[in-house]
Regions:
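Catalytic-face loop-and-helix region of soluble metabolic enzyme cores
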Residues: 150-151, 159-173
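Mature N-terminal, pre-catalytic/accessory segment of carbohydrate-active enzymes
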Residues: 229, 234-250
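Generic structural signal for well-ordered alpha-helices
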Residues: 6-7, 90-97, 151-159, 181-182, ...
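Conserved, mostly hydrophobic/aromatic
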Residues: 100, 134, 184
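Substrate-binding cleft of secreted/luminal carbohydrate-active enzymes
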Residues: 138-147, 168-231
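Hydrophobic faces of well-ordered beta-strands that scaffold small-molecule active sites
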Residues: 18-20, 107-109, 134-136, 167-171, ...
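Polysaccharide-binding and catalytic clefts of secreted carbohydrate-active enzymes
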Residues: 1-130, 139-144
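Acidic (Asp/Glu)-rich catalytic clusters
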Residues: 125-129, 157-162, 184-186
Length: 262
């Protein structure tokens, strides 16, 4: 069914490519900001939230490995079961990519932030997908993270993506959007995708994004198409070396200092 749909889309005159979204399992682990909405805590994998235990999946896994993952004490710790689940999603992505490429068109996708996170949360091992362009959804606010989350994700994505895939960074528009774009472009992203289009509808927002894009193009033109900041892109593992984290700590201290002591 999916293959025939993609073939039909690829035959549309003037279409340059196909971008897939939601090629994944239902969230095994939700972003932290959504836990209160559903009244749950997902500090680890819980079987009741993993919808990968479909009878057909179980039978296919048993045929390959000779045992039922459900019979284990904690199936979430079974590397074979995790990789098997990821491979089912990868198979669909690459089937679509094969069709798209057979028509000479570009293949793109919008997965979760990094292959490692995406594999754990929704079984998207997207570093193995045959993509021309990837737009990982690096919405730091969804994970109650600061701007450093974007930098770290980009460094990880550059390392783990398919070498043939061009990396963009998907960002949700917020007050700190310019800092977010800086973090993405300075740590490996070759471009930015913005969610949602409604954030681009005011003259002021369009002017801001245009000015930012023009400035990035100018910097790259002066440096043979390369962003000079990339040469110093390293993931910060010491929290006391991260200005974003230190600023949040200072803000929290100030907040607590204003709380009256009972």
């Amino acid at each position: 069914f999916s293959k025939k749909k993609i073939e039909a889309y690829c035959e549309v005159e003037g279409l340059n490519g196909i971008a897939i979204d939601y090629n994944r399992f239902v969230d095994v682990i939700l972003p932290t900001t959504l836990w209160p909405k559903y009244g749950i805590v997902q500090d680890q994998e819980y079987r009741q939230w993993d919808f990968g235990y479909h009878p057909a999946m179980i039978e296919k896994f048993k045929a390959a490995y000779g045992y039922d993952p459900k019979e284990q004490e904690d199936p979430s710790q079974d590397g074979k079961w995790l990789q098997f689940s990821c491979d089912q999603i990868t198979e669909v992505a690459n089937m679509i990519a094969d069709v798209v490429h057979s028509y000479g068109k570009k293949m793109a996708a919008s997965p979760f932030p990094t292959p490692k996170m995406a594999s754990k949360m929704v079984r998207q091992d997207w570093g193995k997908w045959n993509l021309d362009i990837v737009f990982p959804m690096v919405y730091h606010n969804f994970y109650t993270e600061d701007i450093s989350f974007i930098s770290d994700c980009m460094i990880e994505d550059v390392r783990d993506k398919n070498p043939k895939t061009t990396l963009y960074c998907g960002l949700m528009v917020a007050d700190d959007i310019e800092n977010a774009m800086d973090a993405a472009l300075n740590h490996g992203a070759e471009g930015i995708s913005i969610f949602t289009v409604s954030a681009l509808r005011t003259p002021e927002s369009r002017a801001m994004f245009k000015a930012y894009a023009d400035s990035v193009r100018a910097v790259r033109a002066e440096n043979n198409g390369v962003n000079p900041a990339l040469s110093k892109s390293t993931k910060v593992t010491n929290p006391f070396e991260s200005m974003d984290i230190l600023n949040r700590i200072n803000a929290k201290i100030k907040e607590l200092a204003n709380v009256p002591i009972p």
